[in-house]
């Protein structure tokens, strides 16, 4: 799936060291940018994403340097004049924030995440972090999304695929009565039994709060550990902390969750000397992942923050 034509950037685009730091005849040195994240970072939904089927889940190692040319890792790398050996995509689909803590601390998840179905072990994960000059962190959406989608499936005996797709698509982002109608239309099409309807209503109007409260606790506990783990490996790296886009503002629980997370991330960045990058309007596709324009927007936000 790799885009071979993106494999190397022209020398004149590479980031050069100051003249007095170079020796005559030596090639110009490049920075190294490493993007940590989940499926948003990896480029799920874009053409040319690379992966292999693994014994458990998927092997994303081919995507570390063979990522889609339209994902924000590629676009940030291009903006910084980096080739693919110096712009690394460590996005791991379905990753949740405690999983990223494990990856940063030991390059491995100790066991499979049963809720998300993910399990990753990459010895090179920490090595990439040690060599990085700039590291971006994107994590936390799955901490709420995965249990919400699983809970909706269990409540409806898995009749909820269309409603779940609508919820994560971004189609409900801008509230109006037409979109509220879409939501209830999808809900009614599921032809639920009385017990299923009761369980679904409880989840949507109460259970979501419980899920999002627990997710917020998990993410706010994990993010400082992720930052500390990165600094233990690489105290000199510049760390960029990405904010959050809410694909379902129609649901009050999700509004509160992402609003609180953005405030927490911004405060954490100020306390820890990180670069906070707000991405509230990243456009998403029907699967809830950024579109090409969404990745362009995220990349532009990062590059502007690095200026």
Residue ranges and their predicted role:
Residues 1-7:
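Sec-dependent signal peptide cleavage junction
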Residues 15-93:
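Serine-esterase "nucleophile elbow" of acetyl-processing enzymes
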Residues 40, 94-96, 246, 283:
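Residue-level detector of flexible, active-site-proximal loop/helix-junction positions
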Residues 44-48, 100-102, 146-151:
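Short, solvent-exposed loop/turn and secondary-structure capping segments
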Residues 49-67, 106-121, 177, 199:
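Surface-exposed intrinsically disordered loops and tails
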Residues 95-107:
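Structural motif
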Residues 113-307:
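Alpha-helical cap/lid subdomain in secreted, periplasmic
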